[in-house]
Amino acid sequence: FTPQANAPAIDSPMAVDTSLLDVYWSELDGQPLPATLQEVRDYADRLEERYGVTILLSSQAKEACESVWDAVITTTDEAGLSDEPHAIARMLEALDRTLALYPEDFFRQMRNSMGEGGVRIMPVGHIDNDVNAIGLTSESYEWQNIFIDVNIDAFEGTICHEIWHATEGVILTRNWDSFDQEEWDRCNPDGFFYNEDAGAPASDPERWTFFYEFHPQDIYFVDAYARTNAKEDRARIMEYMMASEDVAGALMQSPAIVQKLEIMCRAIRDNFDTSGWSDLRWERLLPSA
């Protein structure tokens, strides 16, 4: 063919749209950080390598924070912290301890079939939403984004709570029917319906909860927040199974909590390669363990 010098430019039909790829790599790499954060960035890099997660610090998390539609999340560089490096370091130290509770390849298995995405964790300065959350998980492209407020006193339970949300997100992506709602509802009191609105609790929010009832057979939920919806119910159970040894043992005296945990454990085993796993922390107190 003969090119025409003055012809209008037309995109080739063979051209590849790289916009999504550009977004992926931009979110993966983050932005350069100031020298004052280099030490915590180096620590985060080591955790990424050890556990198979991605960690974004300070301004690196800005784009991910802005992608959340139901909360306003402030990055640590914009939160007016008196010592940003120290605040981030505290959270990373707790994150290190918490991630070590999970099987070696657990988080790598949460990536897609191409090895992309997975769990991305971000220490943030503040989360503003209807329930004043101290942790939040959202999905974006192939990522399960976990945001943790650096100002809280104890991180481990919150991190485990949000890791369950990320785990459930991956499970449902692989098999939407992994949790049979009718089976789950049979683990709840007769006639019970989740409130579905944490900002407007039920008239008797403590009923049937571990911190209110005296008899194990009357306990169906960890606390009032667990009565919000099935996902928060499951996340509360896993939070205490993973991060609170004393409460976990007491919770397992409840037949309903045992049944719920068994359903959760089955969903994990059905959607992860567990052949190399042993002594799973979340299964250690099950009657069959």
Question: Which residues are covered by each model-predicted region?
Answer:
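Non-catalytic architectural context of zinc metalloproteases
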Residues: 3-90, 200-215, 231, 264, ...
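Hydrophobic, Leu/Ile/Phe/Ala-enriched alpha-helical segments that form helix-helix packing faces
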Residues: 47, 95-110, 163, 167, ...
